UniProtKB/Swiss-Prot annotation:
Annotated region (Disordered), positions in chain: 20-98
Compositional bias per record (Basic and acidic residues), positions renumbered to this chain: 35-51
Organism: Invertebrate iridescent virus 6
Protein name in the entry: Uncharacterized protein 285L
Length: 121
């Protein structure tokens, strides 16, 4: 009886050995179904994989989307606007980006400090 399985399966998935029954091929073994728990909880590993897939999908969809996104909001009174009104966003900061060199920034901050001191006198 070399390399031969001698067992039979119960419906609940527990294996029980029998002395008289010998099975030699996989096709003769009855298929059993694995029942998942009905409590609605996913396996922790599956959940992590799902989260990872969602993150990858979002990142690969448009990698420049977050960088180029403009931040704006509307006042609460504008939320119920009629169709003939235009929805013009309110942009935070100026629309044209301003870049200063280090020297310009230092001069600007010094000028602000000087102006504050003049006002306090």
């Amino acid at each position: 009886m070399d390399n031969k399985c001698t067992f039979s399966r119960k419906e609940d998935g527990v294996c029980e050995y029998k002395k008289n029954e010998v099975r030699t091929s996989q096709s003769e073994v009855p298929k059993t179904s694995i029942k998942k728990s009905d409590n609605g909880e996913k396996d922790e590993k599956e959940e992590k994989e799902l989260n990872l897939e969602n993150i990858i999908k979002k990142a690969s969809a448009n990698p420049q989307q977050r960088k180029n996104q403009k931040k704006y909001h509307r006042a609460s009174s504008d939320c119920d606007s009629s169709d003939d009104e235009k929805d013009e966003p309110y942009y935070h900061g100026s629309k044209a980006s301003t870049t200063l060199t280090r020297e310009q920034a230092l001069k600007l901050s010094l000028r602000k400090k000087i102006d504050e001191r003049k006002l306090n006198k």
